[in-house]
Amino acid sequence: MNKTDRRSFLGKGAAVAAAGVAVAVPAVAQAPKKVVHWDGGKPPDKTPLFSGAVSYGNLLFLSGIGAHFEGDIKAHTKHVLDEIKTKLESCGSSMDKVLKCNVYLADLKDYKAMNEVFLGSFGSEPPVRTTVSVAGVPGNSLVEIDVIAYI
């Protein structure tokens, strides 16, 4: 290989290497980060036990939401789904963007009535769902639901 060919080869190699770095740098610069979506837009004065909503990249995780008032399973389920909808929208998502849903029932006998309210709440393509009956839901709620959605 003569001097001219080597220079041409080395010049092309340097250009390819520079292009590779240029492509890799934006990927590193745009790495996802954890964002806590605080109620009211600012962190509380004291460190809370848990966060109500956290996003990572375009994934959004909502902690379990219950209903803490007297009522039947239908009223509790409707309230919880309304709260989920409000929280999703405040974080830039929506019910039809929910990917995964966990439902915790205080009593399995409420399964059918909960489903009557739940049906259609997430649009025509509902998320995957797991439903379990648990020994107790905090705050005497008959149902608690948490979701994972995308933004």
Q: Which functions belong to the PLM regions below?
A:
Residues 96-98, 129:
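Short secondary-structure junction motifs
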Residues 87-96:
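Phosphate/pyrophosphate-binding loops at sites that engage ATP/ADP/AMP, CoA/4′-phosphopantetheine
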Residues 84:
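Residue-level signal for inorganic ion chemistry
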Residues 98-107:
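Acidic helix-start/capping segments at beta-turn-to-alpha-helix junctions
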Residues 2-78, 89, 106-151:
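N-terminal presequence-like segments and the immediate start of the first folded domain
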